[in-house]
């Protein structure tokens, strides 16, 4: 049975950057490091349809296929514990699931989102506000995660190290 580790966080907190660094450092050779953006599914195809709640399940099924025989370190903005437990039908090969929540200060989220390329459409006040609100949910829901990281004052290497150490301890 596979182990599934889900790193979830608001946009602009550094999920994808941390995933890339963890993959490069190769400290977790038994894990495939997979980002939601890399599974080949588009949220906008599901959004507002009767299949909206199927998106997370389809992403995980695809991640399971991509991972081959390896465990899965999966990075997602939307696959937080409530969404996972309410909407996801797990592939049968997944035996254990752990959640890592990550956030940073609202100021840091704003700075990071405004620095992204315009085509990512993350620099509007409404979008940034939505990520601040999502971040507040994370901060108020620390206990829903087996590991919770506030990376406001941490380097990428420190954050990656915390996550790697947690996963190795399982």
Regions found by a protein language model. Name each.
Residues 19-66:
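Conserved substrate/cofactor phosphate-moiety recognition/catalytic segment
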Residues 5-6:
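Short hydrophobic/aromatic beta-strand immediately N-terminal to the Walker A/P-loop
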Residues 119-162, 170:
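Small-molecule kinase domains that catalyze NTP-dependent phosphoryl transfer to phosphate-bearing small molecules
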Residues 16:
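Walker A/P-loop
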Residues 9:
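The Walker A (P-loop) glycine that initiates the GxxxxGKT/S ATP-binding motif of P-loop NTPases
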Residues 106-113, 158:
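Switch/connector loops and helix/strand junctions flanking conserved nucleotide-binding motifs
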Residues 12:
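Walker A (P-loop) phosphate-binding loop of P-loop NTPases
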Residues 54-96, 102:
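Glycine-rich phosphate-binding loop used to anchor ATP phosphates in small-molecule kinases
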């Amino acid at each position: 049975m596979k182990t599934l580790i889900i790193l979830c966080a608001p946009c602009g907190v550094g999920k994808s950057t941390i995933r890339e660094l963890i993959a490069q450092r190769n400290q977790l050779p038994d894990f495939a490091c997979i980002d939601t953006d890399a599974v080949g599914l588009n949220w906008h195809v599901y959004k507002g349809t009767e299949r909206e709640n199927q998106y997370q399940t389809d992403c995980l099924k695809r991640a399971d296929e991509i991972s081959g025989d390896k465990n899965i370190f999966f990075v997602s903005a939307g696959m937080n514990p409530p969404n996972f437990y309410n909407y996801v039908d797990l592939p049968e090969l997944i035996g254990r699931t752990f959640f890592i929540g990550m956030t940073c200060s609202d100021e840091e989220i704003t700075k990071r989102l405004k620095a992204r390329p315009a085509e990512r459409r993350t620099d509007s006040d409404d979008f940034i506000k939505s990520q601040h609100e999502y971040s507040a949910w994370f901060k108020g829901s620390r206990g829903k995660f087996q590991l919770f990281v506030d990376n406001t004052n941490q380097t990428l290497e420190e954050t990656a190290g915390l996550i790697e150490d947690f996963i190795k301890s399982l």
